[in-house]
């Protein structure tokens, strides 16, 4: 049964990741007196799962949001690749996600991230037209060509619309080697 599987997965993530991680982040924000900033991207379906199965986890994210040191990015509601297939469906999902973030976290996202961090200049222009101030995309070495991902770039023809590149090396260290003590 998929409901049982969803609950088991969410329970495991809550126990092993979300609750201990959010506790550490809350402590860091308090210890740094608001100088420590965080950005999350949580799909609409993930928010729904938390609402259904682990409202305590959702509450921990809401408490983080209340610090004023946490922002939520927007994305497609279902973490879909709708940009590649239908602009109207893409826009519908982005608006749906913005509304969910507003309802749950009392924020209006200013930065967008596409599924799998897929980027093209046309997407940046489209997203800027929806009122976003920036987009997060993959910071691959083939794109950077020796430049740093720790800099905000501009999308061609979009003035002050920011393009943020994921620091792949640091992100991979955190995701795959965080607990490596060797």
Where do the model's predicted regions map?
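Catalytic alpha-helical scaffold of carbohydrate-active enzymes acting on polysaccharides/glycoconjugates
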Residues: 1-110, 117-172, 178-182
């Amino acid at each position: 049964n998929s409901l049982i599987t969803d609950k088991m997965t969410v329970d495991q993530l809550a126990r092993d990741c979300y609750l201990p991680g959010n506790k550490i982040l809350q402590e860091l924000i308090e210890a740094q007196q608001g100088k420590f900033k965080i950005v999350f991207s949580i799909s609409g379906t993930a928010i729904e799962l938390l609402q259904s199965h682990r409202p305590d986890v959702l509450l921990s994210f809401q408490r983080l949001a209340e610090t004023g040191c946490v922002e939520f990015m927007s994305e497609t509601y279902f973490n879909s690749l709708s940009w590649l297939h239908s602009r109207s469906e893409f826009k519908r999902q982005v608006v749906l996600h913005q509304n969910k973030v507003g309802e749950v976290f009392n924020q209006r996202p200013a930065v967008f991230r596409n599924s799998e961090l897929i980027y093209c200049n046309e997407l940046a222009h489209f997203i800027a037209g929806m009122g976003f101030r920036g987009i997060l995309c993959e910071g691959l070495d083939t794109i950077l060509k020796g430049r740093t991902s720790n800099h905000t770039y501009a999308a061609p023809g979009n003035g002050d619309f920011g393009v943020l590149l994921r620091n792949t090396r640091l992100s991979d260290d955190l995701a795959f080697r965080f607990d490596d003590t060797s």
